[in-house]
Amino acid sequence: MYAVAVIGGGVSGLSCALTLADGAKRFDFAKGKKFLVVDSGSSDALKAVLNNVPGVKRGTTGEEYLSFLRAQVEEFEDVNLVEGEVCEVVKEGERFKVILSDGREFEAELVVFATGFHSFPVKTELVEVVPHLKSPRPGKIALKPKAEGVFVCGNAAGEITMVATAAGSGVSVACDILSRWAGKVVVPHDSIG
């Protein structure tokens, strides 16, 4: 069983997984935890050219950026990156079951939806679909958690639709989860020296 299942392998989902995996290496309370990322390969970032993302060379394609993020996540053996489409997520007792369209099933203690803002075809009662109020385009959606242990990040959380805010949202959710496990506010800062 996984500690966290991240549904969505775009910028926010990968940023969340990266921060969780890094935290699991740094903090005793998170050591040994395993993480799942399910990626349908449909991130909007795949169509982007990045010109205003802090720390990213101007003109970097979204595909290049996602490949870089994915490679960073793959450095952590505690993260399982799975390609597929999630069709259903249910809560069974204290656990969540993530069901893919090909029949594979995974269990996790917590679930993070990082599914974008176009549509939400996942069958679940764990989130409410609401209008995305910060999208420059009409008809986009956001998700509101309805159950304990459910988190939402990136565009799905109603964030401004930019790569930098999506990454920050994923990192913020990961810090919330790490803090939950620690019983206090925790931030996995990098240090010099």
For every predicted segment, state its role.
Residues 48-105:
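N-terminal Rossmann-like dinucleotide/flavin-binding domain of flavoprotein oxidoreductases
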Residues 24, 153-191:
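A conserved FAD-binding loop/helix module that cradles the flavin
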Residues 4-64:
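Beta1-alpha1 glycine-rich phosphate/pyrophosphate-binding loop at the start
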Residues 5-7, 105-118, 150:
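Short hydrophobic core segments
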Residues 137-147:
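Short, flexible loop segments at boundaries between secondary-structure elements
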Residues 17-19, 123-126, 164-165:
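Short amphipathic alpha-helical segments
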Residues 109-138:
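Glycine-rich beta-alpha-beta "Rossmann" dinucleotide-binding loop(s) and their flanking helix/strand
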Residues 45, 121-122, 160:
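Glycine/Thr-rich phosphate-binding loops of Rossmann-like dinucleotide-binding domains
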